[in-house]
């Protein structure tokens, strides 16, 4: 099993809404590196959801339930073969893991969230995902 981090603006699509929906297609990703990562996701992979912009915290966990397929939100004039995956919402973290805590923790010294902060989908190491679970109270 691999581990991933995806970003969402809570004003657009919060983890609480995701939990109400139970599942969602993770659409709208328009970054070439992120597209590569979406294509690498496998059914059953663990996905941490990060609220960007206002909250700046890892807030919940999800699972990949359908691997990459063509993103239905692509406009006809858009360049690129954009994809999405389907995710199933899991638990909200009892203690959201703030970006400041991630930046100050040596376990995250190489985490993509900090090194490539504009990337909306990124892999996590086993060590990083274990530390997120620990800090988040899971």
Locate the predicted segments by residue.
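Compositionally biased, charged N-terminal/linker segments
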Residues: 1-43, 137-138
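A generic structural signal for short beta-strands and their flanking turns/coil linkers
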Residues: 2, 22, 43-45, 58-60, ...
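GIY-YIG nuclease signature motif recognition
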Residues: 6, 62-65, 125
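Short, charged, solvent-exposed linker or helix-capping segments at domain edges/interfaces
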Residues: 17, 96-102, 133-135
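Hydrophobic beta-strand signal
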Residues: 48-49, 63
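Short, charged beta-turn/beta-strand-edge "cap" motif at the junction between a beta-strand
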Residues: 50-56
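Aromatic- and Lys/Arg-enriched surface recognition patch
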Residues: 61-119
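Charged phosphate-binding loop/patch that engages nucleotide di/tri-phosphates or the phosphate backbone
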Residues: 120-138
